[in-house]
Amino acid sequence: MQGWIVRISHWNTYLPIAGTMQACGDKSSVWKVAIGYNGHPEEATFFNGRRSYAVNNRGAKPEKERTLRLNIEITPVESQGCNQLPTPATFEFRIPHSHFFNWSVELYFHNAVLPSYRCHFCPRPSLVLRTHAISAEYSWLAVDITLGLNRHHNIAVEYVKYIKHLEVGKDIICQLLYLSGYFLYVVPLSIPTKYSKYVSQCTVDPYREAGGF
């Protein structure tokens, strides 16, 4: 399957990470992900397939690891030449300090709807993904998505591997499921049934309103 994946891991850090992506899906394409780490940008290159890239994992296997993978399908509705790719998509992670485990994030982008389309990733001007750790104690991650895409784009976000459930409250559930943008669907695979009633009640971002980052 055509696409690209980037994995970012940090151990006992609290550093903002930002990246930009440019991709073109023909046979000679080279996909690049530039990641800024501690003020020093690093670049990973992907050739027509999947390769993972870790930043500062120090080669050490963490005692515990929390991984969130986002599968994203983007359907372009009008031709955009690969040689004239729009503004690259950007992503940003904010990873909390923790003495107990690494935070690990995996992103995999592909276009499964139009496999013969020349550009396998041709977004509108911007797509920003931000992951927020609500509570290291609960080990829950939330996803806050801001979209600068055309309304006709259809984006699906799915939790492929989910964090083990611990007792949490409504505000955390709402933050976890908080959505912003058009045609966005989140499928948490392991949300406890007793919290499903909160989904329809989540109309605001309680964590940000309470001063969260």
Curated annotation (Swiss-Prot):
Function: Part of the gene cluster that mediates the biosynthesis of andrastins, meroterpenoid compounds that exhibit inhibitory activity against ras farnesyltransferase, suggesting that they could be promising leads for antitumor agents. The first step of the pathway is the synthesis of 3,5-dimethylorsellinic acid (DMOA) by the polyketide synthase adrD via condensation of one acetyl-CoA starter unit with 3 malonyl-CoA units and 2 methylations. DMAO is then converted to farnesyl-DMAO by the prenyltransferase adrG.
Name of the protein this chain belongs to: Andrastin A biosynthesis cluster protein B
Organism: Penicillium rubens (strain ATCC 28089 / DSM 1075 / NRRL 1951 / Wisconsin 54-1255) (Penicillium chrysogenum)
